[in-house]
């Protein structure tokens, strides 16, 4: 993996987030967990001169990875080529609490700064956690979203991370 400046990237964030699945990973090489996400945001927020480059990810309270993101100052968000869709599907449907799920995939964990990503990632953002909040029922104007996405009222936690380093394949 090669480190680049975030400003060198050129991609459609809507396509990347919505069409390509990503992994959110937190912890150390000795103790980490990862999960698949297909919802998220990229942009800039807080600060002068256009704001800080940020990533927003959403994690349900019952996800094992939440504990790792909560306990870590850093997390990674990584994007993969289409050929790894089966691996990402596995990581999104199995819990690291119950098994060493990464060993059931072809992905190879590697350390990046204060966190972990995988060798096969075509793009990895190393993010420093800036904000943690929770989506609430009261905040919804369109109540159909609750019916459609939260029948168990297990509203996502929102994590905003500042992109400190960017790595490409």
What are these regions (language model features)?
Residues 1-169:
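Basic, polyanion-binding surface patches
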């Amino acid at each position: 993996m090669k480190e680049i400046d975030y400003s060198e990237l050129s991609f459609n964030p809507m396509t990347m987030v919505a069409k390509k699945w990503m992994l959110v990973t937190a912890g150390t090489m000795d103790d980490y967990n990862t999960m698949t996400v297909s919802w998220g945001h990229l942009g800039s927020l807080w600060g002068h001169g256009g704001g800080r480059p940020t990533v927003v990810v959403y994690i349900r309270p019952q996800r094992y990875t939440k504990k790792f993101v909560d306990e870590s100052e850093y997390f990674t968000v990584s994007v993969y080529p289409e050929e790894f869709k089966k691996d990402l599907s596995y990581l999104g449907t199995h819990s690291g609490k119950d098994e060493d799920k990464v060993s059931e995939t072809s992905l190879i964990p590697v350390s990046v700064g204060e966190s972990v990503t995988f060798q096969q990632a075509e793009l990895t953002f190393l993010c420093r956690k800036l904000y943690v909040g929770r989506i609430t029922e009261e905040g919804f104007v369109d109540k159909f979203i609750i019916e459609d996405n939260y029948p168990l009222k297990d509203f996502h936690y929102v994590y905003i991370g500042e992109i400190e380093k960017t790595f490409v394949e």
